[in-house]
Amino acid sequence: ESLQTRYAEGGDRAFDCEFMGRKLFFKALNFTSTPIEDSEEAAETSSLGRHLDGCRIGFDLGGSDRKAAAVIDGKVVFSEEIAWDPYFQSDPNYHFAGIRDSLQRAASHLPQVDAIGGSAAGVYVNNEVRAGSLFRGIPDDLFEDHVRRIFHRVMEAEGWADKPWDVVNDGDV
């Protein structure tokens, strides 16, 4: 039995087909066979973290708290944990306001913001939420307009969209 058949609608891996294909990458999974000599070279990966120069904000969004820190040239000048309960909140503004609040609180301890890095459980592609347990309470009809680009919206609201920033899975940090 071919992978294409197993990972198709109605196949025994239909859930994976829907999740990995349409939910994460907005298209159906497609499998092709290629001789090894014709395969593409591995892409370069980008390095995460270890950038200590300048005025930076780091944050981590968990299921019970939000953590944020402000750093100037590698020295922590502010660090805070704030309790929150995002899992079953159905209003995406709860998440937006909480994320924004943590970043603002950290930024208030810096003369300027040079870069931002964040993490949370889930799948993030190009700083967009594709799937995340923090957003499980958001109805599907609100997800696309209010959650998928939530980090872009926060950066734009704060005037930081032109700064270097990344949001990644917390296991990647």
Predicted features along the sequence, with ranges:
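Short glycine-rich, Thr/Ser-proximal phosphate-binding strand/loop in the N-terminal lobe
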Residues: 61-101, 105, 133-137
